């Protein structure tokens, strides 16, 4: 699994720099179906001026062919809509790209593989791979998975387990 490290500069509002004990992995969909809105585009956005003063960040952007890492895993990200709660302060955030010119099945499988790899690396139980909705029930995220596209949450967790055991 090739991960392109392209970190948000230290000291910016969207890189809080607080320690993250890495107890969970939170799965998101980007909410951006625009053509070209893959992992590279999201990497450019999160590092760009438009996001510099926005309290929103995540660790990984995943599409059908690339994985970009934006923050070190052991740093907090602002992604779970729970303030200083465990979603933000204790989890690694994975954003699955849903751009219309991408293979959503491949992107979602790539995210499941990444989640499994992170579970192994940090001793995170597969049961602690959760939806954004877990931290903020009003948020329909990961939207595509919650709608069964390309498959539902049970299948996603099963794919994480398959990659973990494989």
Region locations from a protein language model:
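Cell-envelope and extracellular/periplasmic
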Residues: 30-31, 76, 87, 92-101, ...
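Basic/polar, cationic surfaces and motifs that engage anionic cell-wall
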Residues: 1-9, 14-23, 96-166
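N-terminal catalytic cores of peptidoglycan-degrading enzymes
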Residues: 1-87, 149
């Amino acid at each position: 699994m090739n991960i392109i490290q392209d970190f948000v500069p230290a000291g910016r509002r969207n890189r809080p720099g607080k320690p993250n004990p890495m107890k969970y992995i939170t799965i998101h969909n980007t909410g951006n179906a625009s053509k070209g809105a893959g992992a590279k585009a999201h990497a450019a956005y999160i590092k760009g001026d438009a996001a510099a003063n926005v309290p929103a960040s995540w660790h990984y952007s995943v599409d059908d062919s690339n994985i970009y890492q934006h923050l070190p895993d052991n740093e907090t990200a602002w992604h779970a809509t729970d303030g200083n709660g465990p979603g933000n302060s204790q989890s690694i955030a994975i954003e699955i790209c849903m751009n219309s010119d991408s293979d959503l099945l491949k992107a979602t499988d790539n995210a499941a593989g990444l989640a499994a790899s992170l579970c192994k690396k940090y001793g995170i139980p597969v049961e602690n791979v959760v939806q954004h909705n877990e931290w903020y029930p009003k948020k329909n995220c990961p939207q595509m998975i919650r709608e069964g596209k390309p498959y539902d949450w049970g299948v996603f967790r099963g794919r994480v387990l398959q990659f973990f055991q494989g």
